[in-house]
Every structure is written in C-alpha cells, then in structure tokens.
Amino acid sequence: MTAPSAPSSISVCEAWARDGIQGWPETLTTGDKLRVITAAAASGVGEIDAASFVPASVVPQFADAEQVLAGIDESVRIRVLTVNVRGAVRVVEAHRSVRRIDRCGIPFSASEPHNLANLRRAHAAHKEQVAAMVDTLGEADIDPLIGVATAWGCPIQGRVEPDTVFGLVDWAYGRGVRSIMFGDTTGMADPRGVTQLFTAAVAQWPDVDFIAHFHDNRGVGIANTLAAIGAGVRIVDASLGGVGGEPSAVDQGDVGESGNVVTEDLVAALQQMDVATGIDLAALLHAGRLAEHVLGRPLHSRIQRSGPVRRTEIH
C-alpha cells in the first residue's frame, strides 16, 4: 500500500458546536457554546460549524442558533446546516440580519433507506427540496454545501456503490454546487475505499471543494482523514474531543459507539507531518479542555492526555 502524499496545507473545520453537540443529552447554554467556539476560533481553525437551523421541537440544542451566531466574531468563517426550504429561508434571514454565514450544509444520504429514516424523504422528493434550498441560499450569496452522507455504506442498506455517490455529485454540480462533503456517517469506511472514492471524485470534478467528514466508530477516523488528504481533499472536519457522530434518531440497529474525528489528535498528527493548518496546537488543546469542562466529563483526545510529540523525541 502506497503512503498518501502530504500537502503543504489543510483547512480544518471545527464541528463541536454543531455536529458535536447535536445529540448531547443536556442542552447547553448559549454562553457555554460561545466560550468553546471563541476558544476554538482563537486557535486558528479555518472554519466553525456553528449551529443547525432546524425546529427546536426536533433538536432543542439549536433553539438559540441566531444568538450563537450573534456572539461569534465577524472574522470567523462560519458554516451552518439545515434540512428543508423553511430552514434555508431562516438561514438567509440570519445571514442578512445577524452575521455573515459562509456555507450552509444540506444533508443528502447516498443510501436511500438512510435518507428515508433520517429525513423522511426518498431521493426524488429530497432532490426537489434540495434544489429549492440551493437556489434560496445561492441568491443570498451563501455557499450551499451538499453533504453526501453514508458515502461508504450504512447498516440499513449495506454497501453504497460509488456510482450512486457520483450520481449525486453530478446532479449537485449541475445545480451549481461547488462544495461537496463525503460523510462516513456510521463509521464503515476504510482508508483504501476512501482513497478510491476521493481520488476519482477529485479527478472528475477538479473545481469542487471536496470535504471529508468521518465518524470514528471503529477507530480509523484519522487514518481515513489522512487517506482523503492524500487523495486531494483540502478541507476536513473534526470535533474537539471527538464529540458527536451519527444522530440517534435514525433507526439503523446497533452500530456501536459513535464519535467524530478528534480535532486535537488530527491537528497534532498533521503538525508532526509538517502539514500547515494555521492552528496553534497549544491554543487548540486549551479549547479542548474548555469543551470538557463545559460538558462535564473527559472526552476522547489522546493528545490531551499524552501531550504532542516533541521533535527532540524523534530518532
């Protein structure tokens, strides 16, 4: 197996405040969310995934989405998520009246059974919604990001064929979308499959910003992220302490413990590989400790416990 090549720089999107805490059992205060977001932004992360614009009756954690955005410095690049046209309209209103929103994620599961379970829509019906959302966001100069979930499979359907994923990419590209995420929603990917899918996608659509988003159910999240980087991806998602993962609302059977790639551990690995992220690791570790304090428990960062490798230790 050939080792992936390392680029000179990578942009890391910090997902703690959105994908990280969406399923957290306690609703956090706006102030606590902003404390962690502010610390993460101060470390130099390239983008913050800050909130979901979904009904509070569905996800109470994001009832304060506008208030959270209002508390984030304008210099910080912001991503949010929504799932329908009504939410897209709300995103546009926040963009115009609260603060700039740079990207808005729109989930679209490559597995149709997963899309039905997660969003209650078959592919054909979801395409109608997504097309309207893309138009609504684009008219407001917000970059629509199609998040192709279950890109490597899901427990309901099993394997998802690459042609299905590429069919969604081609459809989105035809709608003018130039930001596309491949998500390993239930931790079924492996580095070889990641390399194959992203290599083909980057070659076929070279003007698309492809984004890698891995859940770490089976402990290969960082390996998969590095494989994506080696295949040409230059934007990757991670979450402080590895918080987050697959929403519990999806009925998909027992898939074990979920979680995102740990931002601190990923950035430490990239730093050791001399890949620039623009992130100050010490400041990021501080943000991770603050996230632990806010959530009231130890999280999953190994670098927080063992410390980063010092160059003098390498022989």
Residue ranges and their predicted role:
Residues 1-315:
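Catalytic cores and adjacent flexible loops of soluble metabolic enzymes
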